[in-house]
Amino acid sequence: MILFKQVGYFVSLFATVSCGCLSQLYANTFFRGGDLAAIYTPDAQHCQKMCTFHPRCLLFSFLAVSPTKETDKRFGCFMKESITGTLPRIHRTGAISGHSLKQCGHQLSACHQDIYEGLDMRGSNFNISKTDSIEECQKLCTNNIHCQFFTYATKAFHRPEYRKSCLLKRSSSGTPTSIKPVDNLVSGFSLKSCALSEIGCPMDIFQHFAFADLNVSQVVTPDAFVCRTVCTFHPNCLFFTFYTNEWETESQRNVCFLKTSKSGRPSPPIIQENAVSGYSLFTCRKARPEPCHFKIYSGVAFEGEELNATFVQGADACQETCTKTIRCQFFTYSLLPQDCKAEGCKCSLRLSTDGSPTRITYEAQGSSGYSLRLCKVVESSDCTTKINARIVGGTNSSLGEWPWQVSLQVKLVSQNHMCGGSIIGRQWILTAAHCFDGIPYPDVWRIYGGILNLSEITNKTPFSSIKELIIHQKYKMSEGSYDIALIKLQTPLNYTEFQKPICLPSKADTNTIYTNCWVTGWGYTKERGETQNILQKATIPLVPNEECQKKYRDYVITKQMICAGYKEGGIDACKGDSGGPLVCKHSGRWQLVGITSWGEGCARKEQPGVYTKVAEYIDWILEKIQSSKERALETSPA
């Protein structure tokens, strides 16, 4: 019998690997060795998700079936680590193995919406209610502060007294304590991690107050904000108290106490100097933090197990080295004279059991911070995080200001700008499907990047050709969703100061509130205008879909769409901007939030523009890119 350890898998989200994004699963394969912990999960995808958010897990093996003498191992999720990023593989029927998605920022999401028919996910049953449907049961779980997963007995369940019963459950790990096949039972998880809870979102931070409730765990953090992020992703933390470096008890300095209570609310706070308290944000619909921390702390040293030390120029370079180094969770960059050479100063790469520093010291000559691996949102680490800062009511852009913008042009008798697009990888452009209505022929298209003025394009101007045009299989018209297309280029782009990719959002960003958004393009600057020579830009506010729907009563504004525009009109995307980017700056990064799709006229009052919501299509984008790579490998010479 195996020992299933009850571990706080979300204590830290700062573990890293450096072998690139490996999302494929290996059937009938089991990784040997490297054991970290074992839990129960209903399928391999959920096992992979748990591995991703475990501080040290790099690989996993899941047993979909088990030998008759080891039935307790069925649904076992075995989390593993490896210094090299790989482990020996053995054949085992029914086993499914794979990699953590820590290095796949675009796929990072704690949300798990799948429903499992015929399974009883067991745990501590703390509430039982009668409901009419599985959906209602899942909603009850999502809106109960303690519920982590649930089981619903259908009307065909063999015991009449339990039919249509909804059992709300929890465990110390946030995962089932066992899973058993049972007919007419259906199980699933709370959707709090999908930002669908209606509980509310207390964001208060209480300076000089402490909560005296039950501690579920503790970690070392540099400030209360990292403490809050750790609490948010811990399965049982509801609120926290953090003691600063000035706290009187030395052993508790920089300690983040993760707390809970039976009622789900903290007891009245106690006045304590140098204590900071607050709430988990896991019930928030709009303000969930990212599972990473960008800040570099000057004059601070993070202690932990040392992986490696190298010499680099500056703390930013040290953070980048940590991000790219296998297993590095945090780092310290030393400026001590004995730690500096001609090529740079010492960068110590470190890790710990829970992914947080084991100790933090101050007045150090240097600085410290965390790996940014889980902050990455695109396949390429080259996506643009910093820039120098159809558009009706817009202004001229400057060269290199929007380096992901491309012009899609058609060469027939003459050559004309038709649509915009966005660079998302060295060989990939994202644009709108409707750009190819009537012109679905790759050979007639030319793609220009790194340009500002269309008039600068001559016969000698380099351009990219289309190798593969991938229009969403469900696309019919722009007003009906799925207005998205991928272009694979014949040859990879060279990234320059003026030609770089934009970061893609993650699936978890579907409910993010963006406040700094821009549209760009060479399209008309008025409804009956003409294509502009200079790339135009305009800042534009997002409009809630509910409000947008009221403006377009003859259309359906779906969750795959996002609206933007001013109530009074005057600024909008227009003809020629189609397929171009709606970008927003969030947490220090520019993200491709929307693709210019359709609207009623241009910049009309009470008529916002409608954009394809990129976060809703991340899986589709990644699937098509991966499929293209696999086809290329199959056709390449041996």
From Swiss-Prot:
Active site as annotated: 434 (charge relay system), 483 (charge relay system), 578 (charge relay system)
Alphabetical list of Pfam families matching this protein: PAN_1, Trypsin
Name of this protein: Plasma kallikrein
PROSITE patterns: APPLE, PAN, TRYPSIN_DOM, TRYPSIN_HIS, TRYPSIN_SER
EC identifiers of the protein: 3.4.21.34
Function, as annotated: The enzyme cleaves Lys-Arg and Arg-Ser bonds. It activates, in a reciprocal reaction, factor XII after its binding to a negatively charged surface. It also releases bradykinin from HMW kininogen and may also play a role in the renin-angiotensin system by converting prorenin into renin.
GO CC aspect terms: extracellular space
Annotated family: Belongs to the peptidase S1 family. Plasma kallikrein subfamily.
Lineage: Eukaryota, Metazoa, Chordata, Craniata, Vertebrata
SUPFAM superfamilies (UniProt xref): Trypsin-like serine proteases (SSF50494)
